Amino acid sequence: MHDLWPTILLGIIEGLSEFLPISSTGHLLVAEHWLGERSETFNIFIQLGAVLAVCLIYKERLSSFLFLWKDREKLPYFLKLSVAFIITSILGLWVKKMGWELPKDLGPVIIAIFGGAFWIYFTEKVSSQRQSFVEEISWPTAIAVGASQVVAGVLPGFSRSAATILMAVLLGVSRPAATEFAFLLGIPTMFAASLFAWIEETHFLKNPSLDSPLTLATGFCVSAVVAFISVKWLLSYIQTHTFIPFVWYRVGLGFFLIALVALGWKTQ
């Protein structure tokens, strides 16, 4: 059981930070510094655990997409999700083809954390001037949200949730509607990204993970449970609150990471 504590803690951190607009990357970097770096396969499993939580929360919405031929009113929403995902996929593959790689030090992550804080603050200030918000996702909004996922992907620390949710809010969508669209879009996006990363990691299944099945299962389950709780909380919170508190949390996280760098900590 003692050997599983690092796995449990990393699962908790992933579950808390994956869908909140606070950046899972920044938190996992710090955690893995003290708990030990984990394999890409382990990271994929805890991310999939978080995705499963969102699937369970939106199970009715997702199941309704299986019967679009019965309920045509949901077809436009499904098509907008599909187009947003396609845009994310095309732009993501283009960025990958250009040779982009994840940064190997904390500098770019810290910049992205502060950049995400500014993005949230700016969007909330602009949206505070609006007299009303819309509940429907327009085609321009769907396209913009799909593109914004790529920004979060190339700037680890920015936060996919912060990029997508706040993009929709900036374009006049209510926080609950923006969050739902962003989370539903995140399901196929994160599944696809996890599959792509897994294939790369295993070199087409020729180099299997050294993690034990117990380790992978524990990380997956812990992440799923914690993500379920945190997403449920967020969906309730945004009914009556703004995202401004996350700005100050991110600023605090950014300065904490700066302090670590000043003390000589490196990720390599």
From Swiss-Prot:
Its EC number is 3.6.1.27. It is found in: Cell inner membrane. GO terms for biological process: cell wall organization; peptidoglycan biosynthetic process; regulation of cell shape; response to antibiotic. One of its GO terms (cellular component) is plasma membrane. InterPro entries: UppP. Keywords: Antibiotic resistance, Cell inner membrane, Cell membrane, Cell shape, Cell wall biogenesis/degradation, Hydrolase, Membrane, Peptidoglycan synthesis, Transmembrane, Transmembrane helix. The keyword Endoplasmic reticulum does not apply. The chain crosses the membrane at residues 39-59, 75-95, 106-126, 179-199, 214-234, 243-263. One of its GO terms (molecular function) is undecaprenyl-diphosphatase activity. It is a multi-pass membrane protein. It catalyses: di-trans,octa-cis-undecaprenyl diphosphate + H2O = di-trans,octa-cis-undecaprenyl phosphate + phosphate + H(+). It comes from the Bacteria. Pfam families: BacA. Belongs to the UppP family. NCBIfam families: PRK00281.1-4. Catalyzes the dephosphorylation of undecaprenyl diphosphate (UPP). Confers resistance to bacitracin. Bacitracin is thought to be involved in the inhibition of peptidoglycan synthesis by sequestering undecaprenyl diphosphate, thereby reducing the pool of lipid carrier available. This is Undecaprenyl-diphosphatase.
